[in-house]
Structure formats: C-alpha cells, structure tokens
Amino acid sequence: MTEKFLFLYLSLLPMPLLSQAQWNENSLVSFSKIIASGNHLSNCWICHNFITRSSSYQYILVRNFSLNLTFGSGIPEGQHKSVPLQVSLANSAHQVPCLDLTPPFNQSSKTSFYFYNCSSLNQTCCPCPEGHCDRKNTSEEGFPSPTIHPMSFSPAGCHPNLTHWCPAKQMNDYRDKSPQNRCAAWEGKELITWRVLYSLPKAHTVPTWPKSTVPLGGPLSPACNQTIPAGWKSQLHKWFDSHIPRWACTPPGYVFLCGPQKNKLPFDGSPKITYSTPPVANLYTCINNIQHTGECAVGLLGPRGIGVTIYNTTQPRQKRALGLILAGMGAAIGMIAPWGGFTYHDVTLRNLSRQIDNIAKSTRDSISKLKASIDSLANVVMDNRLALDYLLAEQGGVCAVINKSCCVYVNNSGAIEEDIKKIYDEATWLHDFGKGGASARAIWEAVKSALPSLNWFVPLLGPATVILLLFLFGPCFFNLLIKCVSSRIKQFHMKSPQMERYQLSVIGGPSTYKHISPLDASGQRFRETMEEFSL
C-alpha cells in the first residue's frame, strides 16, 4: 500500500521538478558518494537493492576500536533525547564487547508484594474483585499488563479467604501486614516458578521525569561478550552508576545498538536467552540512566547481504568484455561474501553510519510534534523516505535500474555522475550484463565474444604444434648433441700420442735411437745427433 502511494506521488510530480532535484540531499546519491570517496573508486557502477524497509541497511557490531563518548548530566533534551529506531542487525562471527546497562537479577525465591486499591469498592478488607489491580502501585509502565493469580490465605478478619497477587517486576525490601482498606499481595508460589529480569535504571524514579516513561532494553545478540574489555564500557558503567539523571552520546559515525524488549532473558520453560528472528536492535545516538536497561554495544552501518555491489567497467570497446567478466566475478563473490565481494574501510562505514543517522534524526524531528507512537512512526516514515529517494533517483535518471537494483555511475574523476545522457551511454553494457543474470553462462559468453574467431587458425594448428614442440624440446636435443660431439673429439685426441709412439718403436730397433739425447728448447741436440747418425 505504501509503495502505491509513493508511485502515485511520483506520477503527479512535474518532470522539471525531478530534473532539478537536489541530488546532494538524496540518500541514494549520498550513500554512493560516501562509498566512492572512502574507497577511491572511479569508472565503475555502484548498485543498491531497492529499499522498501530501513533494514535494507543494517548495523554491524564493532570489536576493537577507541571511542570517546560525550557525557552530560540532567534531563536529556533536544538532540540528547533518546528516540529508538529499529534496525536490522548483522550476524557476527566474532565476539564483541557489550555492556549490561542494568544488572539482571533472579526473581526466584524472592519476597515481593504490591497493593490493590480497594477503597473505591467500599471494602474494608480482602478480597478485591479479580481484575481491580492498582496499576500505579503494582507495575511499571511499559511492562506487560500484570496477570492476576488467585492465592489463598486466612488472615484474621478477612472473609472469604481469597485474594489476588500480581507478579513483581522489581524486588522490594518492605512488608506491610496491615493493608487497611487495601488487599495485599503476599509472597506465594508463582505460575512461572523462576525468571531473570533487568533491574530498573538508578535514575528511573527521578521526580522531573514523566511517570509514563517506558524502560527500554533487553538482550542484544549472541555475539555479545561482557568480559571483553573496552574503554567505553568502563566509562559508561561508572557514569551511569548514579541516582542523578545522566546521558551519554556517541561521536559522529557511531551509534549505540541496544537489545529490544522482544528479546527475553531466561525464564521458566525457556532456560536460554531468546532473540528475535531476524535479529534486530534499537539504534540510539544517546542513551541515559533513566529509561535504558539491558544490553548495549557500539556499531556502524553496513550494507545488508549484497545490498551494495561494485561493478568494474572500462570505456574502450575492446576492453568492455573484460569489464563484464569482472562484474560477473564481483556478483558471484557477492552471493557468498557478507559484504557483496567488497571491502569497506572504517572511514567509509563511519560516514555511512553518520549519513543514515542524519536521515533518521531529521525524520524524527519532522514528526516530533505528533502525538502518535513516535517509535513505530519514525520507522515507517524512515522507510518511506528512503524508498522515495530511491524512486526519485530512478525517475530522475540518476540511477539505472538493472536486476531490481538501482545503479549509479562513478565517473573517471570519482564523482557520482548526474548527467542523464552520460549515464544512459554508460549503462549500455550494464543492461546487457543484467540480461545475462550474472550467470556462469553469461560470463563464458562474454569471454568468447572477447576472443577473435578461430576458424583461420585451424590449418595452422599442425605447424604451430611442431614449432611449439621444437621450442620446448629443441634446446635439450641441441645440448645432448654438443656433449656427444665433444666427447668423441676428446677421445680422439687422447688416442693419437699412443699411436705415434707405437709406430716409432716398430720402424727402428732399440739400437737405432741409442744416440738420441733429450731435446733442448731449440732442438740443437736433436740435429747434432742426426748428423752423427748420417756419418
């Protein structure tokens, strides 16, 4: 129904208004600018899933970081006032530091009783009719309506012996055995035999705070670990340990993520903490020790699943197929990786968190004068505003719609392109890719289209194979041939002197060379010997 009204609203808008829209105030454009500038992106597409709920962007719990909180005293007013915004909470595989703003206690085997107002019934003694429980004395506002259980006892002067008892939300140390025109709820056996509850904040009973204040909070996430040290935890715990109203706020970019009331501590029949499905959290920029209970952590904004996917592309036609392949790989990774195949820097996450929080603040401020339930209304208006921004971006031509995603183009200078004609020109390959559905077949077709035709190469396949084999094994055969020839030559030189000595010993006898003396360097002795031999 909400989407129909949005489309009707857009259809009635004049086109010049859409073309002259202030894109700097558009949430889709703002998110894209933060992602592009924080990660130095250029010449690519940033695709967002269409937002129909604010949980399309979710908050992640942060592990190790330094955080400087802002502290203040007094009744929180203005920007320090806590107005919750329910957001989706990312599943964390790591333990994160969390803090119980108020300590839990076990209600089992505790003495507890509250009063029933019976004076209006003109009764001087018990019992009070069932259902006439004095809410001002029996429960805190915001807790479920107390269930009245009958309980039998026989105090003197009270007939019949039936009274009623409301389960206590917080323990009291006093006991009044003289009701005097009131029915007292005495200690007895509950239908729920045991349960764990959060204590009320220390400054909850401050006189200047409205009595109808709803205590907010519950368990946050299974990833929470109370034992992990963190500087902000000790500071916040020490600051809130006071009966004086105090508040604390996160720096820009960070938020408090606190457990909602729908998450329950253990009770009879459910020995473990129960969490909502899907996991949600209450987002605050400021919390106080007046109304906040339960478990809180600090977090940042991140995309949900593959809510944001980065597609790389290039301008030249010959490289377009390569961009298509990269896009397919990015989409394939995005289906597996929790961050859409893209790494977000800490600065980017803080800026995204700050932007979404600014939108939430302006949304809450715009409806602050309404007397309706501001918590649920803030979420509805927030959803509608984000959805409207996305639809305005689509109608204005700033984003190209592909596969149910709204894609904005980051130009060569790293800025979000707002020229409709340029966006249309650059979106040609994106639409072609979208028709393929980022499937393996589409990627393979892109690879084949990028390669030239192989028909002309078939006749050359045989010679090319021979040449390839020669290149591979030719050096080995050449080295082997060289070694073989060198070995034969060496053997030939070693046998030659032996043959000469053998021939000389056969031609002349032993007496033939008896007058030969060793040669000197000039050969003179050899010539003299030969002359004597000739004589």
Curated annotation (Swiss-Prot):
InterPro entries xref list: TLV/ENV_coat_polyprotein (IPR018154)
Tissue: Expressed in placenta.
Compartmental location: Membrane
Keywords: ERV, Glycoprotein, Membrane, Signal, Transmembrane, Transmembrane helix, Transposable element
One GO CC term on file: membrane
Segments on the Cytoplasmic face: 343-456
Membrane among keywords: yes
Major localization listed first in the record, in broad terms: membrane
Residues of the signal peptide: 1-21
Chain ranges on the Extracellular side, renumbered to this chain: 22-321, 478-535
Membrane-topology descriptor: Multi-pass membrane protein
Transmembrane domains' residue ranges: 322-342, 457-477
Glycosylation sites: 68
Family that this chain belongs to: Belongs to the gamma type-C retroviral envelope protein family.
PANTHER family per record: ENDOGENOUS RETROVIRUS GROUP V MEMBER 2 ENV POLYPROTEIN (PTHR10424:SF74), VIRAL ENVELOPE PROTEIN (PTHR10424)
Protein's recorded name: Endogenous retrovirus group V member 2 Env polyprotein
Organism name: Homo sapiens (Human)
